[in-house]
């Protein structure tokens, strides 16, 4: 999977297909807050997402409180957003 930074146009196009994901102010990253029925559902999501992240060798920044999981994605080695971030965001949307 390519680790080249996306152009602004590529990122904007990708975001139109990623429900709920937005650019992070002051940083080259994308973020989304997921809400679930309860803690078990939130933790289940994190477990499934972690397995996909490991397969991609690309790991999210995330924060969990009860039924909410806040996720931020960026490719640190590229100091920006790459196709890996978009692929993981798509997978997270699909399993949420």
Swiss-Prot record:
Biological process per Gene Ontology, one example term: tetrahydrobiopterin biosynthetic process
GO molecular function: 4-alpha-hydroxytetrahydrobiopterin dehydratase activity
UniProt catalytic activity: (4aS,6R)-4a-hydroxy-L-erythro-5,6,7,8-tetrahydrobiopterin = (6R)-L-erythro-6,7-dihydrobiopterin + H2O
Pfam families xrefs: Pterin_4a (PF01329)
CDD domains: PCD_DCoH_subfamily_b
Signal peptide: none
Disulfide bonds: none
E.C. number(s) listed in UniProt: 4.2.1.96
Entry keywords, A to Z: Lyase
Family: Belongs to the pterin-4-alpha-carbinolamine dehydratase family.
Name of the featured protein: Putative pterin-4-alpha-carbinolamine dehydratase
């Amino acid at each position: 999977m390519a680790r080249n930074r996306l152009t602004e146009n590529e990122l904007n196009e990708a975001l139109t297909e990623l429900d709920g994901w937005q650019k992070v102010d002051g940083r080259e990253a994308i973020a989304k807050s997921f809400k679930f029925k309860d803690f078990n559902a939130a933790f289940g999501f994190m477990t499934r997402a972690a397995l996909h992240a490991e397969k991609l060798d690309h790991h999210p920044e995330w924060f969990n409180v009860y039924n909410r999981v806040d996720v931020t994605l960026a490719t640190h080695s590229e100091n920006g957003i790459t196709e890996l971030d978009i692929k993981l965001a798509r997978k997270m949307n699909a399993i949420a």
